[in-house]
Amino acid sequence: MYKNFDVVVLITCFWRRENSITFVSMKTFVIVGCGRLAGIVSEAVVKGLLPEYELVGVYSRTVAKAERIAGEMEKIGKSCAVCTTVDGLLALKPDILVETASPAALREFAIPALKNGTSIVTLSIGALADDSFYREVCETAKENGTRVYIASGATGGFDVLRTAALMGNATACFFNEKGPDALKGTPVYEETMQSEQKVVFTGNAVEAIRLFPTKVNVTVAASRASVGPEAMQVTIQSTPGFKGDTQKVEIRNDQVHAVVDVYSATA
């Protein structure tokens, strides 16, 4: 069983994309970033959970990590290229590029990938908080007949959020509860948080992802599905002894009030 909620959502992105239409051919995909999350995606291939997809290439700045995943494919009789550059990866002409690296990586290769005719499934949604980059990505995808699939991460209900936002006059807020250990290494961490509950951040989604570039991608995902990063108000709370993550998105307009409240045991 897969215990990481983000990865379950990522695998579901694949399943939903193809199971809503008639299959016509095998799709090829590549992975950028070969850490723990990429390993879980490749494991899904090995276990036959993505039967309509073939992993044909991997890229990582740590070559040994890419070689490990390619080795797993070799064990099941599949060829998977270990690429030393993103250009080399795109030369494989994959249908889809799966990004499990970082927002910086997405900024680096998103436009070249889309121009290559390669759609993207990304976990590093935080990069899309930048409006100019977001617009460039959307325009490039449209011009090249490609798409960017945003994994919802540790929340959901994006269809509801989108509907409420399109109705007009909507406001939205995002509440995230974490344990203090999950915030170690960030600018807000203090030892007192181990014994005292504390609100460590209030602001919008743009400010949140700037301060926590790898911790709150989900706030940007929810904001892009609704009111936008500038308008999405974010509160992050640290609670002593708390394990996992609580993500609660709330949206209101003149006619609708919706709440999506999800707890995940793995932060």
Protein language model regions, located:
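N-terminal Rossmann-like dinucleotide-binding module
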Residues: 23-74
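Rossmann-fold NAD(P)-binding glycine/threonine-rich loop
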Residues: 125-145
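Active-site-lining helix/loop region of Rossmann-like oxidoreductase modules
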Residues: 32, 40, 149, 154-267
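General beta-strand structural signal in soluble alpha/beta enzymes
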Residues: 99, 122, 148-152
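Conserved N-terminal Rossmann-fold NAD(P) cofactor-binding segment
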Residues: 63-92
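A short helix->loop->beta-strand "cap" motif at the edges of active sites that frequently abuts
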Residues: 116-118, 144-146
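Beta-loop-alpha module in the N-terminal Rossmann-like domain of NAD(P)-dependent dehydrogenases
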Residues: 84-115, 127-130
